[in-house]
Amino acid sequence: MAAHSSLYNEDRNLLRIREKERRNQEAHQEKEAFPEKAPLFPEPYKTAKGDELSSRIQTMLGDYEEMKEFLSSKSHPHRLDGSEDRPGKPRYPLGHDRGNGAASSSLRTHVYHQPIHTSAPGSRPVGNISHSPKMAQPRMEPSLHTKIYDGPRLTQDHLSQGHCSRKCDRRAEGDSAPERKLSPLISSLPSPVPPLSPVHSRLQGTSKAHSSGVSSKSCCVAKSSKDLVAKAQDKETPHDGLVAVTSLGSAPPQPPCQTFPPPPLPSKSAAMQQKPTAYVRPMDGQDQAPSESPELKLPLEDYGQQSFEKPDLKVPAKAKLTRLRMPSQSVEQPYSNEVHCVEEILKEMTHSWPPPLTAIHTPSTAEPSRFPFPTKDPLHVSPATQSQKQYDTPSKTHPNPQQGTSMLEDDLQLSDSEDSDTEQATEKPPSPPAPPSAPQTLPEPVASAHSSSGESESSESDSSSDSESESSSSDSEEEEENEPLETRAPEPEPPTTNKWQLDNWLTKVNQPSVPLDGRGSTESPQWRQESKGVAEGSSDQQHPDSKDPLPKSSSKTLRGPSEGPSLGRGAVRNPPLNRNPHLGKPWAANNPGNPPRLRPGRAQASSQAESEVGPLPYGSKEQTSKDRPKVKTKGRPRAVGSREPKPEVPAPTPQAAVPRPKPPVPTPSEKRKHKSSTAPSKAPSAPQPPKDSAGDRNPEHSALVSLTQSQGPSHSSRGSSGSVRTSGCRQAVIAQGDGCKDKLLLPLRDTKLLSPLRDSPPPTSLVVKITLDLLTRIPQPLGKGSRPRKAEDKQLSAGKKQDSETKSCDSSSRVTKKRKVTQKKSTVTRDTNWISRRASSSSSHTESSRTKAPRSSSENSRKEMLPPASASSVSSSSSSQKPSRPAQKRPRPDEDTCSQEPPRSASSTKSSSTDPPAPKHRKVQARGSEHKGSSGDAANAANPFPVPSLPNGNAKPGKPQVKSDRQQADFHMKEAKKLKCKAETMVDKAGKAFKYLEAVLSFIECGMASESESSAKSAYAVYSETIDLIRYVMSLKCFSDNTMPAQEKIFAVLCLRCQSLLNMAMFRCKKDTVMKYSRTLSEHFKSTSKVAQAPSPCTARSTGVPSPLSPMPSPASSVGSQSSAGSSMGSVGVTATVSTPVSIQNMTSSYVTITSHVLTAFSLWEQAEALTRKNKEFFAQLSTKVRVLALNSSLVDLVHYTRQGLQRLKQSPKGP
């Protein structure tokens, strides 16, 4: 392995040197494009808190200018030496090389970690980036750090070795010397450092590349001064850093302000480099990661070159690895530098490392060293991969390698103190302070990772704004290649700490889903590629880490899982964070706004877990996870519901949706983390099992990662997602979604799918459909019944439908709806059946009453109306076809008509004139009687023409029918008037006669349509006027002349038959009245039959005895009745009429007038028959074509018959 790594290292070193030179040139060009001195932010991102934070950071990290010079002078020579020595050493030394890599990575991590601190201060001052040296250094000095890298790196190596030795002692004491070096690094990394170490390594690599290209100038001067300052500050600032971090974390209430600035600074740096306004989004945290990416790319190139130059520095870092246990991050930085330097190396690493990752992943999961190694792997990976990573890393490209060197030293000291403090704090779980310290103090890995993600962004933004835009441009480019790989994984850890506080604020304020999307999408390729290197490197590192005490591996394993899910922050932060990430990330995903409490607790838990994991094996890690779950439980009460459905957490996944495509590669590690995260989310109350499972799964995940080393970029993507998460819990969720795409995404999608199903809109639509069906069915059955029934049924069905719809909506149960529908259908069916039965029964009853009424009426008419026996027979036949309704209405209308009609008749001698003024009741009855008398056929025939739809004339159509009848009546009346006017204008008598006859037919149709109208003009009056018109037409020519032509005779026959049938229609209209009068008069005559004298009626009247037969005194009874000489009854004793009841007189007159219509009809019919004999052929053909016309024929038949006859006449050669 060592030999293989050595070969890789040599090749990579060469590639790195070339790449660094190239990238330095590019970085310089790009830096020229971007003013170096241009302030990152027009205004300080933060005011009061930012100043306070920057002061603390300066105190912790030292003055930026001093550190810049110190680091540049220090890191540049070492980087050159390191790069030279490195080639000879295995690219991925199992023990020593890795230790060296870990040392440099830890240095980088510290540098990156410091950027986190500086990030907060840097965020407040735009121009402060240069003023707050330590804060700005992370971003501004990536190249400077790289320049000074070797010196600070060595010093940091010593520091980090001291720190790592402490952690390594805690974590594991049974590893080989190289492994011990690595293990201290790894152990320090696993605690807080591991996640950060990748970032640091990336920072260191960036610093190397940049220092080789840009910072080599001030390398020596800045090196010594800055190295000393960095060491002193690191030693002095560990507590200060911890304080600052703790203040950030301890101010969870203020996380938005304190925690937020660090992420914003990266975002700001990125914004300054890419978009000047992006700094505004630093509050979003990771939103601006993508913004940083462009500038980071430039630093990455420099970084790649510097990483080549830094092999010697890495070697010293190796020697000082024990100290650099925290600097194991710096070791990672060298690796990341190499990774960033050589894309080809990264590709090679990607290809070669997958198996090592499998072996290493499980043990080194807890160790951030694997991140540095993955960084190396990316270096081995082809330059294309490196450039891809570079490209992807721009947002992560942090010129922190140089800064990282000085800041790494500061951070190493801070990390040592912070780690101890973090461990204490984690143990304590002050969730507010812990999260800030978690990002910076808690896990140096976290701090490094945070620096890598958040700080990398912050420092990158700062550096892009100032000198870092020059030195960091090249370094960023190189680091972006290398760091992104490492930073991807470590980044998730910074997200853990910053994520807890900052993300809480960000989740509430700037839900980092956008940052995640932009950053994840922008960096996704970088992270994926880098994560390949990171995953491979991490697997290698994990392998040495696995050699290192189990605590390291456990912590790294935890990190691996957390990395895996691209929840990188939580996972990479610490092993506990990994556990926490499961809980915390889901929680963050579900409760982006609630993360503040939970995240602080988690950050502390992460620090504790990392501290504990360092000394503890997997078992202890599980314990730590248990403890951490407790911390999570604090924040988790909110997230329990949301975390448990972490698969459903996809709610935040919408934000993660974009990142998801990125994490497809990181799926294995994300799966691991997802598994652990899912377990905690499923068992929030039992976080320990999830964490245990996370720890147990970590090996599996490591294996998965090794298998998916090609998916390593996904790890880095997760890290990047984690860093994005730092800006918000949603980002963590997104990372998680990315990692868990296979597992988590499905739950998320399922959750989304479930929610739509819960909405249950289909039931409503079903209800609507059912309603439509019911409506269609209801009208049909109702059509059989009477219209009122239809309306009622419709109302019932509508009510039922509404009820059923309401119930179905309430229950949202299709079954219930179906049942209701069935009930509705059954009800509708029952209603329909009931309506049909009722209709049938009513029809049968009507028929029976009809038969009875006609019989009685016919008997009465026969008894009282002997003279018009024929008329009585006709009336009886017609009445037999008529309904009994008229009979039922007879009493009142008859009385009214009897009382009112006589006065009318007295006023006029014509019965026709008396009838029209009759009351409405009488008119209605007359209409009914007319229909009855006209025979069922006539009534039925009338229906086709807007005639009332009364087959027998017994039932009056409903209101709708009345309206249509009225419309039809008006229409026919207009047509009749038009034809009449035309006829009047015509000169030809024959043509005029024909036109008049056509008008007559229209009048007849109007009368038929008006029969159903009770309040409309009486059909009786229409028929009467029509008869008058026919008489006028007949008067135009003398049709009695035998010499008239056959056409005229035929025309005369048609006119006579029309008159005859119209008379019959008039009789039918008054039939009910006539029948009543007949009964009344017969009774009256019976009572007076004792008087044998003819004037008996008159005598009775003269006696003044009121007629007992009178049903009721008519209103007209009070009116003095005058004898009507013209009455058909022709009372003999006119003078005695005064004593005769007026009602009897009126009834007698009306009776005679109405019955006279029947007589007239017969007379006219006979005349027509006489004329027909002369033209039998014509009428025979007409009858054959239409139908035989008779006295009892309906008016409809008459109209049809007459029209056909007129048509034939017109068509005949002799026609008019």
Curated annotation (Swiss-Prot):
Residues 1-52, 68-104, 116-139, 152-217, 244-275, 352-728, 777-969, 1094-1125 are annotated as: Disordered. One of its GO terms (cellular component) is transcription elongation factor complex. The gene is Aff1. The modification N6-acetyllysine is found at residue 682. GO terms for molecular function: DNA-binding transcription factor activity. Residues 207-217, 710-728, 824-846, 867-886, 902-915, 1115-1125 have a biased composition (Low complexity). Gene3D superfamilies: 6.10.250.2670. Its main location: nucleus. Keywords: Acetylation, Nucleus, Phosphoprotein, Proto-oncogene. Pfam families: AF-4 (PF05110), AF4_int (PF18875), AFF4_CHD (PF18876). Residues 9-35, 78-99, 166-182, 789-808 have a biased composition (Basic and acidic residues). InterPro entries: AF4/FMR2 (IPR007797), AF4/FMR2_CHD (IPR043640), AF4_int (IPR043639). It comes from Mus musculus. It comes from the Eukaryota. It is found in: Nucleus. Residues 252-266, 429-438 have a biased composition (Pro residues). Belongs to the AF4 family. Component of the super elongation complex (SEC), at least composed of EAF1, EAF2, CDK9, MLLT3/AF9, AFF (AFF1 or AFF4), the P-TEFb complex and ELL (ELL, ELL2 or ELL3). The modification Phosphoserine is found at residues 183, 191, 197, 755, 760. Residues 408-424, 457-484 have a biased composition (Acidic residues). This is AF4/FMR2 family member 1. Residues 383-406 have a biased composition (Polar residues).
